[in-house]
Amino acid sequence: MYDTIEDFLQSDNNIMPIRYPYREIRKMTKGFKIKLGKGGFGSVFKGQLRSGCYVAVKMLDKATGKGQDFINEVNTLGRIYHANVVQLIGYCVDGPKHVLVYEFMQNGSLDKYIFSKPNDNEQCLNLHQLYDISLGIARGIDYLHKGCNMRILHFDIKPHNILLDDNFIPKISDFGLAKLYPRGESIVSLTVARGTTGYIAPELFYRNVGGISYKADVYSFGMLIMEIAGRRKNLNALAEHYSSQFYFPFWVYDQLNEGNEISITDASEEEMKVARKMMIVGLWCIQTRPNDRPSMNKVVEMLEGDEQDLEFPYLKPSFYLQDLPKEVDGNNHSSSMMTSSELEDSSIDEIVEIPKEKDEDSSLPQTSQLYALNLPSKAFTFNE
């Protein structure tokens, strides 16, 4: 398997990750002594190279199948370099053991900073810092979409997959669900929907919303930046409908559309302007139809520009609580849907892969469901 990976990298890139023997992996981690955490595809340990540099060593789970997640990581991270994308230093393949070695991110993942409570031990980041982090993430995704020989779709942009270095520079990580396709092609073919509950674009479920493209990552970024600006998760299924606690983007849209100010605890007036800009950008990114969303290049421009120059989206984002996936049986290719209480009890970090329905007449939910989709005949679009 690794001959195929190496041939691919050598033909397309001058940067080659190092292949380590397994004994070297055990040595750099001191027998996997310090466990940093566990993600969707395996456990991560702290290691140290002979040079003295610290690294994060990911041991991929055996349950991850035929090694596609390993191939995805090496085929993407092994060929690129960007300040806002985590660097793959090396890898190891030893029988069933698949190991990835990354640069070490001192401050861990973003989720613990935006979802932490005031009495938590984590450093509290102000809105200016969170804005800088958001802009860095946007630049990283834009690079994946347009800065490489092949377009790279991440398909799992979320707070847990954004790592922060010692200067709180954000780095996009975890490319296990990533897909590469030629830059000249606008639509990508998928046999299954992929991503994490709460960040998955609607076109991954409903064909007549639009084709699957890099705009799926734009949607995920929109959900992410809404959570960053609000310092909270977008969904609380146990809260009252139409309240700020139920579905944050709905509430933000209504407040801003009515000309109301959104109050954030301990935020200065200048910070509130920054938060408002981030929220407006987020609302553009989570538009239901892909063509109504900006490209990540445009997102970077919007974030770098003045808040007063931003046009407010007149399409309210749509959300279907009854259509969120609960679980997937990979053997029989069936899925079930969550109720409100089940969604609240579920892990937001659960990665799901959902087989696309073969029925060509699959359509959007009807108005009898929780929220009806309201798509006017004329819409402002971001075509390229």
Language model features: what each stretch is:
Residues 70-75:
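Regulatory alphaC helix of protein kinase catalytic domains
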Residues 1-6, 55, 243, 262-384:
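Intrinsically disordered, low-complexity cytosolic regulatory tails
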Residues 45-62, 87:
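Glycine-rich ATP phosphate-binding loop
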